[in-house]
Amino acid sequence: MSNISVIGTGSYVPNNIITNDFLSTIVDTSDEWIRTRTGILERRISKGENTIYMATESAKEAIKNANIEANDLDLIIVATLTPDNFMPSTACSVQKEIGAMNALCFDISAACSGFIYGLEIACSMLKNSFRNKALIIGAENLSKIVDWEDRNTCVLFGDGAGSAILSKTKEEGILEFHSGSNGLKGEHLTCGVLKANNTPNKNDSLEKNNFIKMNGKEIFRFAVGAMNETIYNIQEKTKWDLNEVKYIISHQANSRIIEYTAKKLNTEKDKFYMNLDKYGNTSAASIPIALDEMNKRGLLNKQDKIILVGFGGGLTFGGVAIVWSI
């Protein structure tokens, strides 16, 4: 049976930068308060770019990086909790925009774990069918579901998209997954129906349950536990020692979660790649944006062992062990 490898990455973030200082003009907060509690300095907020546009731009980059044509794609999966439409799916809209007319397309909703879930689904579908290449996208326009009057949540989130292209290969690539869900704790991170318009300057007069609501303490506890469990299980399946792993690329939610997880794992914080200071929490987009940034910066070399790990609303969690092949 063929192996599955990552052969290309791409990403897109809006040009519009919202700093902590700007947020301090619309809610009772400060740069120091946000920075020390989250590690976030700024985030990108869409100015007209919708989820389809951001997903499409990241897909174009990934296709170019993989040195393939859009028609080479057999599968497109978009992980998002902020679609522009319920139908057609974001994946079908991306298919239209990039001209990937040979691809089977669908969306999944698993919040911040969505990209990991997408990778696992794609790997299974590639291994068990005639399909050879898949495009996995995490794309979010979270600014439209943020309560810009709630300082506990509006400081956390940003917009963006990231993509990865998978292909059947002979060389070692994606090795093992560990994933799961805990719907019993779903109430700790919720969002109702989507809003049509929402800006950092004012909220439209809709019910507050249309926005992201989060029990921060419970999510912190869940995140640290889920990350530790996931990494431990991946180590068990791969027989990797953490010293062999070059990077752990986790969901970019909060620097304290990452620092605490590193401490629990008895490993250095620098093993965890972080870019949340620039982008905030972009949900399903955070891991692929980080992966693409690392790829562009030349931080990953062939045969490097890396672990991707995510957690989020649902509640959901998941991780994957990858031998880098680009």
UniProtKB/Swiss-Prot annotation:
Enzyme Commission numbers on file: 2.3.1.180
Any single biological process term in GO: fatty acid biosynthetic process
Pfam families recorded: ACP_syn_III, ACP_syn_III_C
Protein name: Beta-ketoacyl-[acyl-carrier-protein] synthase III
Free-text function comment from the UniProt entry: Catalyzes the condensation reaction of fatty acid synthesis by the addition to an acyl acceptor of two carbons from malonyl-ACP. Catalyzes the first condensation reaction which initiates fatty acid synthesis and may therefore play a role in governing the total rate of fatty acid production. Possesses both acetoacetyl-ACP synthase and acetyl transacylase activities. Its substrate specificity determines the biosynthesis of branched-chain and/or straight-chain of fatty acids.
GO MF entry, a single one: 3-oxoacyl-[acyl-carrier-protein] synthase activity
CDD domains documented for this protein: KAS_III
Keyword Acyltransferase (UniProt): yes
Catalytic activity: malonyl-[ACP] + acetyl-CoA + H(+) = 3-oxobutanoyl-[ACP] + CO2 + CoA
EC class: transferase
Domain statement: The last Arg residue of the ACP-binding site is essential for the weak association between ACP/AcpP and FabH.
Subunit structure: Homodimer.
PANTHER family found in the cross-reference section: 3-OXOACYL-[ACYL-CARRIER-PROTEIN] SYNTHASE 3, BETA-KETOACYL-[ACYL-CARRIER-PROTEIN] SYNTHASE III
Record-stated family: Belongs to the thiolase-like superfamily. FabH family.
GO CC, alphabetical: cytoplasm
ACP-binding: annotated span: 252-256
Domain of life of the source: Bacteria
Location(s), subcellular: Cytoplasm
Catalytic residues of the enzyme: C112, H251, N281
Pathway membership, UniProt: Lipid metabolism; fatty acid biosynthesis
InterPro entries given in the database record: ACP_syn_III_C (IPR013747), ACP_syn_III_N (IPR013751), FabH (IPR004655), Thiolase-like (IPR016039)
Signal sequence interval, chain numbering: none
